[in-house]
Amino acid sequence: MVIGVFPAAKLGILAIKQVSKPIANVIKSNAKSSPFFRKYICMPPAQFYNWVEVKTKMWALNMGGRVNVPPLNEAMAIELGANLLGEFIIFSIGAGLLIFEYSRQTIKENKKNELAQSEKMELTNMLTEMNFRLERQDAQIREMTRVLADLDSRNIFRWHKEPIQEYVPFDPDTPDQSASARNPKKFDSLYDPQGGMAFRALHFLDTQIFVDGRNRKAKEALQHLDEVAVQLEQSLGEAATVAVASSLPTKAADL
């Protein structure tokens, strides 16, 4: 059973989200007791929020116009400002965690893409190198075949059965790359009539001399079978005649 990597980063993000509200409550309570926070941090946002809320409600009720919005008293402004500060802190922590997680996933995905790209480039380089090696080997084999054919043409004694064929590069569409598949046999004898002098002589003996002997032996065997059949038929006829002749006197005596 394969166990995945423990998601420590996601667990840490979840823990920070859970403690964000208590942190906001602590900051909110400290802001209420601090004169600086009450005057410059809590009250201005609270008064602005109250003004926007009243204007929005008046516009929704079709009661807009030049309406003076009464400001909140100090206690209400401090309370509303502290609540807004706490909500802003919770929102900031959540947004920061979201941005952090997005950045982490983006970096991880980029690394994965870079790794896949590097593997693809490595495979491409390997295939290119293999193709280059195959082309070089094809050229070397073609040159060796040419040299062998040249040497074979200069030799008066040709001991091989078939002439050296021209080198053909490998074709993936043709699984059988043997010489017999590329150059099928076009003669009935065991010896190539286009080969050397010895092969031509053997071909002549096999197709012109020995074939007459084989035919003569076959004719003699057929004639012998015909003679045996004739003798067997004559023997059967004589046996039948003797049997009939021997049965006639016995019948005459009975009468």
Curated annotation (Swiss-Prot):
Pfam families: OPA3 (PF07047). Transmembrane segments: none annotated. InterPro entries: OPA3-like. Keywords: Coiled coil. Residues 108-154, 212-241 form a coiled coil. One of its GO terms (cellular component) is mitochondrion. One of its GO terms (biological process) is regulation of lipid metabolic process. The keyword 4Fe-4S does not apply. Residues 168-187 are annotated as: Disordered. Belongs to the OPA3 family. This is Putative OPA3-like protein CG13603. It comes from Drosophila melanogaster (Fruit fly). The lineage of its organism: Eukaryota, Metazoa, Ecdysozoa, Arthropoda, Hexapoda.
